A protein has these predicted regions:
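Positively charged n-region of N-terminal signal peptides that target proteins for export
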Residues: 1-4
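A beta-rich soluble binding module of mature secreted/lumenal proteins
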Residues: 17-177
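Bacterial N-terminal signal peptides
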Residues: 6-14
Length: 177
């Protein structure tokens, strides 16, 4: 029994923490990390336990001296009536490809599959995918995205194999503190 546990744990560490990225959707080829830094609003996501019940979710990215990125996710828990914050780190593994951890040694793939820019050339909307169809986010520099833009993103998500009927629209209306 102990031997089985050691084999399973070793397998998990080898395969679960692998540095080989395996995105399920295309990843953009041109990307400037410094233009991605700063605050983003979560607009759409797939459901998962670590964001359950959260609204007004934001992510803030800061560059560390070693080239990694500090990630601060913040959301308002409606049931508890309080803000929740999680701080993680992202390591670049390729162009627009990161391994993100909020609980070492467990990493998840974070791949930028689409970036839209505003008239000034700044990144304004990002579509984030992962190693599985369980994770998908639409982020924006503003709390609102035009419906026609979201419709186009959802069409792309479906073409990549995502079930868009499961996606959650994040509420950013005032009144949650």
């Amino acid at each position: 029994m102990n031997r089985l546990i050691v084999v399973l744990l070793t397998s998990f560490l080898i395969f679960g923490c692998s540095s080989n990225p395996t995105p399920v959707a295309p990843v953009i080829e041109k990307f400037e990390a410094t233009k991605y830094l700063g605050k983003w609003y979560e607009i759409v996501r797939l459901p998962h336990s670590f964001e359950e019940g959260l609204q007004r979710v934001t992510a803030e990215y800061r560059l560390n001296d070693d080239g990694t990125i500090e990630v601060t996710n913040r959301g308002y828990n409606i049931e508890l009536g309080e803000w929740e914050t999680a701080i993680g780190h992202a390591k670049p593994v390729g162009t627009a490809m990161y391994k993100v951890t909020f609980f070492w040694p467990f990493y998840g793939g974070y791949y930028i599959s689409e970036l839209q820019t505003n008239d000034a050339g700044d990144y304004s909307i990002a579509v984030i995918t992962s190693d599985s169809y369980d994770y998908f986010w639409v982020l924006s520099r503003t709390p609102k995205v035009p419906e026609n833009v979201l419709d186009e993103i959802m069409k792309k998500a479906e073409s990549w194999g995502y079930d868009t009927s499961l996606m959650i629209r994040v509420n950013h209306q005032a009144g949650y503190q």
